Design a protein with these regions (language model features):
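Structured catalytic-domain cores with a bias toward divalent-metal coordination
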Residues: 1-274
């Protein structure tokens, strides 16, 4: 049910991993399904009569990436549990996902930073510096601005990411998981607020709204509160991964979880929320 691909070394030599999770049958037929997905992504030259059978045989491709910003630790720290759930759960919903979706996951888009942040936290836990920002950049060349490299691909990690989502897999939907401040909403999901860039296909923006509404609905159905959408984060931003993907016909989405102090608990009083 899982395939792990080492795309190569990061800027400082750590492995950049891509994991693919789906049903056992889909994993065994991954090359064929990848070919079908590429044909449907760019159907020029394919006979019209072949399109419907390809759609019937193909699978949805969804990509998610975690912790591009290394201090936003929740994404990467969550991936082992998510992977375990998808591989071991036997309920009908999980099986439906595995049967119909090829899930392409980048468990850490900045492996160097993740190692730095982990080392920094372990060094400072129990001291006055516990939970404070690391006093150097968590990427050798770009620091926090690695999220501005979704178009030029200057960083080797960006090259691996572009290879994954623009060449190898071309997903129908993509989510880039981040953290925001601690005293606002608990979780942001699309749709973005206005303005949005007008140059992508309008249907992609509508798909983003549909995905985000479904995520919010499922969370609130389970009793989660503080879900925000259509506010705070506009659809007109720098060309990071979630904002450049709509121009590749991919429903690119950002999530922002309420911020944390690494593994140290934080306490938010009701009057602090705004």
């Amino acid at each position: 049910k899982i395939k792990v691909i080492n795309m190569g070394p990061s800027a400082e030599g750590h492995p950049f991993l891509v994991t693919i999770i789906s049903s056992e049958e889909n994993i065994n037929n991954l090359d064929k399904l990848q070919k079908i997905n590429k044909m449907l992504t760019d159907p020029r030259g394919i006979e019209e009569s072949l399109i419907a059978p390809l759609i019937e045989e193909g699978k949805a491709v969804v990509c998610q990436s975690m912790s591009l910003h290394a201090s936003e630790v929740g994404g990467t720290q969550m991936t082992p549990e998510l992977t375990h759930d998808l591989l071991t759960r036997t309920d009908s919903e999980t099986q439906r996902i595995l049967d119909n979706v090829i899930f392409v996951m980048v468990p850490c888009l900045n492996p160097d930073g993740q190692v730095m942040i982990t080392d920094w936290y372990r060094e400072t836990v129990g001291t006055d510096y516990e939970g404070l920002s690391m006093p150097w950049l968590y990427h050798k060349y770009s620091g926090h601005d690695n999220n501005r490299d979704g178009d030029y691909h200057n960083l080797v990690e960006s090259k691996y990411m572009a290879q994954t989502i623009f060449v190898d897999w071309l997903p129908q939907a993509y989510i880039d998981h981040h953290h925001m401040g601690s005293t606002g909403a608990r979780f942001f999901v699309p749709p973005y607020c206005d303005p949005i860039r007008p140059y992508a296909d309008p249907l992609v923006w509508r798909e983003i709204s549909w995905y985000g509404a479904h995520i919010a609905y499922k969370l609130e159905e389970q009793g989660f509160k503080g879900i925000l959408n259509a506010a705070q984060f506009a659809g007109w931003g720098h060309f990071g991964w979630h904002w450049i993907t709509p121009f590749h016909n991919i429903a690119g989405m950002l999530t922002e979880s309420a911020g944390v102090n690494y593994a140290t608990p934080i306490y938010i009083q009701p009057e602090q929320l705004r």
